[in-house]
Curated annotation (Swiss-Prot):
Stimulates the host immune inflammatory signaling system allowing the host to combat the bacteria. Stimulates mouse interleukin-6 (Il6) production. It comes from Francisella tularensis subsp. novicida (strain U112). InterPro entries: DUF3281. It is found in: Cell membrane. GO terms for cellular component: plasma membrane. Induction: During infection of mouse bone marrow-derived macrophages (BMDM) expression decreases when the bacteria is expected to be in the phagosome. Disruption of genes for cas9 or either of its associated tracrRNA or scaRNA increases transcript levels about 100-fold both in culture and in mouse BMDM. It holds the Pfam family DUF3281. This is Bacterial lipoprotein FTN_1103. The keyword Cell membrane applies. Disruption phenotype: Significantly decreases interleukin-6 (Il6) production in a Tlr2-dependent fashion by C57BL/6 mouse BMDM.
Length: 282
């Protein structure tokens, strides 16, 4: 009996050693090579809505494992100077070439010849919230080799976050029998569409954005005014009907499902006063 147990133990150890040896052998069955590639290198601010872009000569190591998966690691990069040929930058809709003074003040850098253009290397773009694709095209000669940039240089995807905060306070100048608490209660009926909670902050109206949502810093309408953002989001919308001295929410509920770029803070249209508010996804 003891002999049988001993043989089983030896067999398990042998299987374990074979398995471990197999893993070591498979793990070593890979190939590593170092190559030079042209890449787009970006330097951006915190929310990535301003990015400087440069075409660089990069040294990249490629490791291909036994499963055929390739892992790339950037070893070094050198900006291309005195390019022979033409570089043309291509950016997705909504982007625009940046002002070099903004690049200097925010990033401490500059575009080529202090001018950010579609043909300079480096250049810079201002980017809208969301996913932005930057690519490069043209034909250049590097170290005697002619390169088709559109084919050989992979596009770069930059995800831009909304610049904002989780809380915003609106001034109010409510009149008649309209109370701040009534306004808060009415807006909170649509809080799930606004992705926020409304409350009173002294005599002002406060919006607290849900996690994953922000209020854009540059959207700050005075009472009776409105602001328009570059991007839309879902909103809560209510109106105060003066002759009835009551809020109406349901008749405007269809607007909750619309994507609106407007923010209304007590905008008067005839005998109605409107509020339209909602936070933006980060």
């Amino acid at each position: 009996m003891k002999y049988g147990n001993l043989m089983m133990t030896k067999k398990k150890l042998l299987i374990g050693m074979v398995t471990i040896s197999g893993i070591v052998i498979l793990g070593s069955c890979g190939k590593t090579e170092t190559v030079n590639e042209l890449l787009i290198v970006d330097q951006c601010n915190d929310v990535r809505d301003l990015c400087r872009l440069e075409l660089a000569n990069a040294q990249v190591s490629r490791y291909t494992n036994f499963l055929g998966k390739t892992i790339k690691r950037l070893q070094s990069q050198t900006p291309l100077r005195d390019i022979q040929g033409t570089v043309t930058w291509n950016a997705s809709a909504g982007t625009s070439l940046a002002d070099n003074s903004d690049v200097q003040s925010e990033l401490g850098l500059s575009c080529q010849d202090d001018n950010c253009t579609a043909n300079s290397n480096s250049t810079a773009y201002t980017l809208p919230v969301g996913s932005n694709t930057i690519s490069v095209s043209g034909t250049v000669t590097v170290d005697g080799k002619t390169i088709d940039l559109a084919t050989d240089v992979p596009a770069l995807v930059i995800n831009t976050s909304a610049a904002g905060s989780s809380v915003h306070v609106f001034p109010t100048e409510l009149e008649g029998n309209l109370t701040l608490q009534d306004l808060v209660d009415s807006l909170n009926q649509g809080r799930h569409y606004a992705h926020a909670t409304f409350s009173a902050d002294g005599s002002n109206l406060k919006i607290q954005c849900d996690p994953g949502y922000v209020w854009l810093d540059d959207i700050n309408p005075e009472y009776g005014g409105q602001s328009s953002a570059a991007s839309a989001r879902s909103v809560a919308m209510v109106s105060w009907v003066e002759e009835l001295e009551e809020f109406r929410v349901d008749e405007f509920r269809f607007l909750h499902f619309d994507m609106s770029s407007l923010t209304l803070n007590g905008v008067r249209l005839g005998n109605h006063v409107f509020w339209e508010m909602g936070c933006w996804p980060t």
